[in-house]
């Protein structure tokens, strides 16, 4: 008999709506013992079967659902089916957009909670973020090796969230050849170098692909400020869009060095690109005090909020930084501003921008809205999957 997680009375509603998480407060009891990440059956208070998922005793998310089908076992064949289903969409997208790199698995939205897989050319970069994902590591890798024999697999499960579920951080080659120090990929006509070994997340922010492309329509003959520039994807796109100058700002000299290489790799005019190592908040104030002005500002900061207790402070941070950006824009200038914080809703983010404009003493029009690229889908029953949001704003 399988181990069962029994829900408290009335707490089955989210599972009946096929939400993939069971929170600790919804659990009445466990029937049997399960190890960290082990597959369990989830039943309602009367014992009716609801789902099969992975058990995580140390997490507020006590179980993550693998399947709502009682006949489905969690094995190599299960992972193969999920991977093949996800690949169909990415194949179409890659052909349409001319991509050699994309998100292959977007966790819960692809039916594989806690699993992120990005493909960069012939390298699969894997992140296992939950106890259940780690427990199924061998089955997942076996399925990947069968379906993608041409690809090396590299593990980037070196993220702090693993500690919350009682797991060690892991990183390194799983199978195949070691990735080069910098791997060239292609995106909307750009060549970009990514660092699989040490880069942010899995190496690169694939989720901003379409936003980088959209930037080009606003930048012709314009002076652009690219804040939190990382390795310069927005800068390269701005130069391809015909900007007169782009200033990229980041605290990492290593990232700025790669950004410079990316400009050179695309045979763009390096004299139009400036790279500044500095704190963005500090530099924006310096620019304001000096009377500097820009026509377009890209504001793509890291996540400001990890949990609900940090949300108020994050709102202040987003408002301050966008207020400074609005103050630096010429009349008719464009602010492209983003938040990758899952707890920051699109409505709240829009209100923050409006408040920032009021504090800056400027009127702002919202003219375009952004979200994560199409290889980062959001399944309808898991709205938390929509974490990236952004706006193009025209400053009056």
Curated annotation (Swiss-Prot):
Highest taxon of the source? Bacteria
Function summary: Specifically methylates the cytosine at position 1962 (m5C1962) of 23S rRNA.
Q: Which gene encodes it?
A: rlmI
- Where's the PUA domain? 2-81
- UniProt EC number: 2.1.1.191
Ribonucleoprotein recorded as keyword: no
Q: Which InterPro entries match?
A: PUA (IPR002478), PUA-like_sf (IPR015947), PUA_sf (IPR036974), RLMI (IPR023542), RlmI-like_PUA (IPR041532), SAM-dep_methyl-trfase (IPR019614), SAM-dependent_MTases_sf (IPR029063)
The organism of origin for this protein? Shigella flexneri serotype 5b (strain 8401)
Name the lineage: Bacteria, Pseudomonadati, Pseudomonadota, Gammaproteobacteria, Enterobacterales
Family the UniProt entry places it in: Belongs to the methyltransferase superfamily. RlmI family.
Record carries keyword Methyltransferase: yes
Q: Name one GO molecular function term.
A: rRNA (cytosine) methyltransferase activity
Q: Which UniProt keywords apply?
A: Cytoplasm, Methyltransferase, RNA-binding, rRNA processing, S-adenosyl-L-methionine, Transferase
One Pfam annotation reads PUA_3
Q: Which reaction does it catalyse?
A: cytidine(1962) in 23S rRNA + S-adenosyl-L-methionine = 5-methylcytidine(1962) in 23S rRNA + S-adenosyl-L-homocysteine + H(+)
What enzyme category does the UniProt record give? transferase
Q: Where in the cell is it found?
A: Cytoplasm
Q: Which SUPFAM superfamilies match?
A: PUA domain-like, S-adenosyl-L-methionine-dependent methyltransferases
**Descriptive protein name:** Ribosomal RNA large subunit methyltransferase I
What GO cellular-component annotations does this UniProt entry give?
Answer: cytoplasm
